[in-house]
Amino acid sequence: MKYKSLFLTSCILAIVFSSCKKCYRQNGFPSETRTGANTFGGYVDKIEFLPCKTTGGISPVKKLEASSYHGYGYAENYVDFGILAVNDCDKHYTYGRSISIQFDSMEIETNKTYKFGSRSDNSKNKVTCQYSQDLVDYNSDSTLSGSITVTYYDNSKKIMSGKFEATLKRRDGPETVNITTGVFDVTF
């Protein structure tokens, strides 16, 4: 009986502590750097977006993630590359916000500008952008304005830096959002 109550108390404490929320926020809007500082920022319809992740719960997603994959059969310089920035600390949004940028089988080069395309386009060699706010998705499209400039890319050091701007369209409606002054400096 004593072990049963000890086990029950341990379970309750584990649940309480795992649901505690502490916010890990980036310090201020980032400047343009090329050092792999793991910073990200932008303005969505003139509202600042910075990565911020609460701890607790069971979500494995970090506030800022970047990854690269060299697919089988790809030419040597072609990679899949993704950046995901999450903000679930802002109390104005029930389910939080996120920005995702995806290079799909691209040859990434320093000081090159890429136009955003459509996520629904099944072709390779494209770059896409998505903004999610309270479970509503806004996506890049080749008919809308938007581009990303890679200001620094070093696959051996695993660093990518750049800036971006885009007009994104709601997936199931006519509404749009504008992302301006987007900057990032990430390691992968």
Q: Where are these predicted regions, by residue range?
A:
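Surface-exposed helix/loop patches within compact recognition domains
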Residues: 57-155
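Post-signal peptide N-terminal segment of mature Sec-exported envelope proteins
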Residues: 29-47
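Short acidic, glycine-rich loop/turn motifs
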Residues: 44, 85-89, 166-172
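Residues that act as N-cap/strand-start positions at coil-to-secondary-structure junctions
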Residues: 34-36, 142-144, 178
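Bacterial lipoprotein signal-peptidase II cleavage site
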Residues: 21-28
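C-terminal or internal capping secondary-structure element at the end of a domain, subdomain, or sheet
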Residues: 145-188
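Sec-dependent bacterial lipoprotein signal peptides
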Residues: 1-20
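Short linear motifs in exposed loops
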Residues: 52-53
